[in-house]
A protein has these predicted regions:
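A short beta-loop-alpha structural element at the N-terminal edge
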Residues: 15-29
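Short acidic N-proximal helix/loop "leader" segments that mark the beginning
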Residues: 1-10
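Acetyl-CoA-dependent GNAT
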Residues: 44-103, 114-116, 120, 124
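Conserved beta-strand-loop-alpha-helix junction that forms the acyl-donor binding cleft
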Residues: 105, 131-140
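Helix-loop element at the rim of GNAT/NAT acetyltransferase active sites that forms part
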Residues: 29-46, 59
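Conserved GNAT acetyl-CoA-binding A-motif
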Residues: 121-134
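Conserved acetyl-CoA-binding loop of GNAT-fold acetyltransferases
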Residues: 144-148
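Conserved G/P- and acidic residue-centered "switch" motifs that form tight phosphate/ATP-binding loops
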Residues: 108-110
């Protein structure tokens, strides 16, 4: 797995790093409102911290799972890739998910996560990336027609 980090000097945006299962509680705090208040996750119940920890660990076995942090280390958002479909022909196609804390919307967190995830997946040989989440689609559209 490729390890990448970006800086947090003033004006540079969030620090992006690879997640670990120990991030589960902080990332679940970002995810839970999406489960409770929207339909984008397709989940009925908020997972437990242990379930979320296992999801992170499972994803990291093959794909990048990124965390965006503020200068003081607070999680602002996260993004990860997963298999688009389970069939072998889809090995180089990925589904992307990006979640940003509500108080961090509009601050470039999603864009920073998307850009880093895109670079990591390209380095891994991914040739197709897809997300069905409306906000993720809007974010990709901002990057130009090749991403929408």
């Amino acid at each position: 797995m490729v390890q990448q980090e970006s800086g947090t000097a003033a004006g540079e945006g969030p620090r992006i790093r690879m997640a670990t299962p120990d991030d589960a509680e902080a990332l679940l705090a970002i995810y839970a409102p999406y489960v409770r208040d929207t339909a984008v996750t397709f989940e009925w119940d908020v997972p437990t911290v242990e379930e979320f920890r296992q999801r992170i660990a499972h994803t990291l076995e093959r794909y990048p799972y990124l965390v965006a942090e503020s200068a003081d280390g607070r999680a602002l958002g996260y993004a990860y890739a997963g298999p688009l479909k389970e069939r072998k022909a889809y090995d180089w196609a990925c589904e992307l998910s990006i979640y940003v804390a509500r108080d961090a919307h509009g601050r470039g967190v999603g864009g920073a996560l998307y850009a880093m995830l895109e670079r990591l997946l390209a380095a891994m040989g991914a040739t197709y990336m897809e997300s069905s989440q409306a906000q993720s689609y809007a974010l990709r559209s901002l990057r130009g027609p090749a991403y929408a």
